[in-house]
Design a protein with these regions (language model features):
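Short beta-strand elements of extracellular/lumenal beta-sandwich folds
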Residues: 33-61
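Feature activates predominantly on carbohydrate-active enzymes
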Residues: 257-475, 481-508, 688-689
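Acidic, contiguous N-terminal accessory segments
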Residues: 23-27, 128-308, 562-569, 760-766
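Short acidic, flexible loop segments centered on an aromatic residue
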Residues: 42, 60-91, 132
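Flexible, acidic glycine-rich loops studded with aromatic residues
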Residues: 560-568, 573-769
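Intrinsically disordered, low-complexity Pro/Gly/Ser/Thr-rich segments with frequent PxxP/GP/PP motifs
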Residues: 82-122, 554
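Short, compositionally stereotyped local motifs that mark structural "simplifiers"
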Residues: 20, 211, 730-833
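Active-site neighborhood of glycoside hydrolase catalytic domains
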Residues: 468-583, 591-595, 599-601
Length: 833
């Protein structure tokens, strides 16, 4: 892993206070400050008013020789007339503002308002502009960038924003979680298949013995480490209690390779399985049973028979948009393994960065892993997502995994029975790779033209005009160039070499394949020539050509390909016949209303499917519409109850409420939709969560968006056939409520205290509020929490009134927070008038 920490280059010049606010401080400062404000909605159809207030904080008039840059989630910007300061997009989510000929020098202390229109209304604070910096120009030379102080004004009337959590609906929803019985010893996450109590108990007090054959040495070592670190139990040769890891004598019991038995009696804990993976799963169950206990640890005699329903249970982590260090990713791997998840989808490349060292293609990290101020991207990419303007700074915008880092990650994950599936985003979402290979071309073009063009991914003569979903105009690889396939095979072979050195098998590489914009390739001479040569009639034929070529390259290298759902859509039957046999997994993500049938259509067509449903498993979707909840919302809101609600074999019944929190008619939701056939059912391999990083600014934010909502993913991957799935009407609702209540009890009683003890960040839910007959009622989904509230409009804190029972309330506004495990939730507001 590389974090760049070189000092910021010195200023090119600072000849006047107005250029860099030089003043009396040794540290140069920008001569301006900014205040951003969201204006009126629907200034014109599809556009919303925004404004910056630009203030001259220097001691001299502000001339016309400057540009201010900033980042913001992608959107169109436009202005009416001839503004004094122009605001425009540079590319994607990177913008700039600069004075026009209409600009008159701004006197010291004076301010001016810069108004512009944006597509997309901003209804959460994490979508506001950020990363503002100033660059001045003199005699054709730029100064070094300087940060600009940005004050973001609160969104107007946040409680009236669409999606703002309704305190009364939350209260009513929480009522279904009442009257839950006490947890049993085996009530863990994910739930075990079968548990049987017995007479007696075992007590673990300070020391424990551990017996195992050589085949389970790794599992024994990891168990020993966890017993010591988490519970203070020392493993010794002889102790009153022995934990035995054994091979299953009746291997016919093993439903699959991850099956295990766990038996506890008076002096022995026995974990039996047919494979090391099964043994590992059994050790995680034992460790989970200890979570809610105190030393000395008493475990009642019992037996467990357990196995997963789905053999693929994964989580995708995006380290491209914003960087997660290898140590933090290992922390996640350890946590995922504790919940018996078994795949890490390693999203290391995208438009905004390339994060893995590839020998022979050094530009991928020398250029593609760094973001900072640049006018030509010859040494770094443009800033974005608040990654900063300094390409050498230790920010979330900069960094990559060295070859050694990645090999270490592979070994670490493999010991914990987690496969790492790398993803090379292609042909779309490939801007970082495209820019990096342009830099390589420019480096060699004057000395070795053949070497310069060897891995080029773009055609200089291409005049295609397009905009991706993220508003990039240059992020798609040219699929007609032989150098494209040399590049892809080079990366694949280098990846395979890393896996070999790690001693870890590589079966597939994920090739991306999603969100290729309309209009790509149409202006490419090479693509037009290829279309003519191959008798192609439409642009999709080029996409089909790319994926079939890549499938052959993968097969030539002993691998199968994986990709997002687009890799299996719209092809000729001939292409389908080829791809079905060469696919390891098609990751179906777009299940928004109107598109949700695609998942089962792909499975019915013979492709192996991984369910990645945006409405249930996109962890980067905000928990709800509160303006201070980070995340996106294009696919809905996802919290721990929504992930728990997902039904792999009844996906149309997987979203129980709409965006406003109103109940959905589940019977109507599935009516007339594509039915999963018996063959299609066999093609559902598993489930996966996605965590894209556009709104993440720290590892703390990674954990916040994962926990607790990832618990629903872990549960549903292990137990894919919940009891309520086959029920209907009131019986179905009652069974679901009972299961959900138990799930929340496990999270609040077992998981949240564990996370708090072990430095894992997590989110607390809002309390629900109701004012009825002049009294304030409150509740919360988790047990053991405090609800504190105010009635004067102020923000609740740890000293605010504690709600314990209905209290008289005639205030026009009530604000409340949940407090638990040293944390507090975001405040929720209930207006009673």
């Amino acid at each position: 892993m590389k974090i760049f920490k070189l000092p910021l280059a010195g200023l090119l010049f600072c000849t006047a206070p107005l250029l860099a606010g030089c003043g009396t401080s040794d540290k140069p400062e920008a001569p301006v400050s900014l205040t951003w404000e969201m204006g009126t909605g629907n200034a014109e159809p599809g556009y919303y008013e925004n404004s910056f207030v630009l203030k001259n904080i220097s001691g001299a008039p502000l001339p016309r020789n400057w540009t201010i840059y900033y980042s913001q989630l992608p959107r169109n910007v436009k202005q009416v007339g001839n503004p004094a300061v122009r605001v425009e997009s540079v590319n994607g989510n990177f913008f700039k503002m600069y004075p026009t000929e209409s600009f008159t020098p701004l006197a010291p202390g004076d301010s001016m308002r810069v108004t512009f229109l944006c597509s997309y209304k901003i209804d959460r604070n994490s979508h506001a502009p950020e990363g503002t910096y100033w660059v001045a120009t003199a005699d054709g030379k730029e100064s070094s960038p300087l940060p600009v102080t940005l004050n973001t004004l609160a969104l107007p009337s946040p409680e009236s924003l669409p999606g703002y959590p309704d305190a009364t609906k939350i209260y009513e929803s929480n009522l279904r979680l009442e009257n839950v019985s006490a947890l049993k010893q085996w009530d863990i996450l994910p739930s075990v298949k079968k548990a049987t109590s017995a007479e007696g108990a075992v007590v673990l007090d300070g020391k424990v013995a551990l017996a195992y054959p050589d085949a389970y040495a790794v599992e024994a070592r990891l168990l020993k480490e966890k017993l010591s670190a988490l519970y203070g139990l020392e493993v010794v040769d002889k102790a009153p209690v022995t934990i035995a890891l054994e091979t299953l004598t009746d291997k016919a019991k093993a439903v699959n390779d991850e099956y295990y038995d766990l038996v506890i009696d008076s002096d022995r804990i026995k974990i039996s399985a047919a494979t090391p993976h099964g043994v590992f799963n059994g050790t995680q169950t034992l460790l989970a049973m200890l979570k809610g206990k105190k030393a000395p640890y008493r475990l009642d005699a019992m037996s467990v028979e357990d196995y997963p329903d789905l053999l693929y249970r994964g989580q995708m982590i995006d380290i491209a948009r914003n960087f997660t260090t290898v140590d933090n990713l290992k922390k996640l791997v350890d946590i995922f393994a504790s919940y018996k998840m078994n795949v890490l989808h390693f999203h290391f490349s995208d438009d905004e960065a390339w994060r893995l060292e590839i020998p022979g293609l050094e530009e991928l990290t020398a250029v593609g892993s760094r973001r900072g101020h640049t006018t030509n991207e010859s040494r770094c990419l443009y800033p974005c997502y608040d990654g900063g303007y300094d390409p050498d700074a230790a920010t979330v915008g900069n960094g990559y995994y060295s070859r050694e880092d990645f090999i270490g990650l592979l070994r670490y994950a493999a010991e914990r029975h987690i496969r790492v599936i790398p993803e090379i985003e292609s042909p779309g979402h490939a801007r970082a790779a495209i820019v990096s290979m342009k830099a390589r071309y420019n480096k060699y073009k004057d000395t070795d033209v053949e070497k310069a063009a060897e891995y080029l991914l773009s055609e200089p003569e291409d005049t295609s005009r397009y905009a991706s979903v993220q508003y990039y105009t240059d992020n798609v690889i040219n699929v007609a160039m032989p150098s494209t396939y040399r590049f892809m095979e080079k990366v694949i072979q280098e990846l395979a070499a890393m896996y070999r050195e790690a001693g870890v098998p590589l079966a597939t590489v994920h090739l991306g394949g999603d969100e290729v914009a309309r209009g790509v390739w149409l202006g490419s001479p090479k693509c037009r020539a290829l279309m003519k040569e191959k008798s192609m009639t439409k642009p999709h034929d080029l996409a089909e050509y790319f994926i079939t070529q890549m499938a052959d390259i993968m097969q030539r290298n002993g691998l199968k390909f994986s990709g997002w759902q687009e890799v299996a859509l719209g092809h000729t039957e001939e292409a389908h016949r080829q791809l079905r046999t060469q696919a390891a997994g098609v990751y179906c993500w777009n299940t928004v209303p109107g598109y949700d049938e695609v998942v089962y259509q792909i499975a019915n067509n013979g492709y192996p499917v991984i369910l990645c449903n945006v409405g249930n498993f996109y962890m980067d979707m905000a928990y709800n519409g509160h303006p201070d909840e980070r995340g996106l919302d294009w696919g809905g809101y996802v919290d721990e109850s929504v992930s728990f609600s997902m039904l792999p074999f009844s996906i149309y019944r997987s979203l129980r409420t709409d965006g406003a929190g109103n109940p959905v008619d589940l019977d109507a939701a599935e009516k007339g939709k594509t039915v999963l056939t018996a063959e299609g059912r066999k093609n559902i391999l598993g489930v996966q969560g996605q965590l894209f990083a556009e709104t993440i600014r720290s590892f703390n934010g990674v954990e916040y968006l994962l926990f607790p909502k990832i618990m629903g993913l872990a549960e549903r991957g292990w137990n894919a056939y919940p009891a309520w799935e086959e029920l209907r009407g009131a019986q179905e609702q009652q069974a679901f409520n009972k299961a959900l209540a138990l799930y929340y009890e496990k999270i609040s009683d077992m998981e949240m205290p564990y996370w708090a003890r072990n430095g894992i960040n997590f989110r607390l839910p809002h309390p629900g509020l109701l004012v009825k007959d002049g009294k304030l009622y409150a509740n919360v989904a988790i047990r053991g929490a405090e609800i504190r509230y105010t009635t004067d409009g102020s923000e609740p804190d740890a000293q605010s009134a504690l709600w314990e029972a209905p209290v008289p309330c005639h205030a026009p506004v009530v604000k409340a927070k949940t407090f638990c495990q040293g944390k507090e939730s975001l405040a929720i507001t209930l207006k009673t008038e």
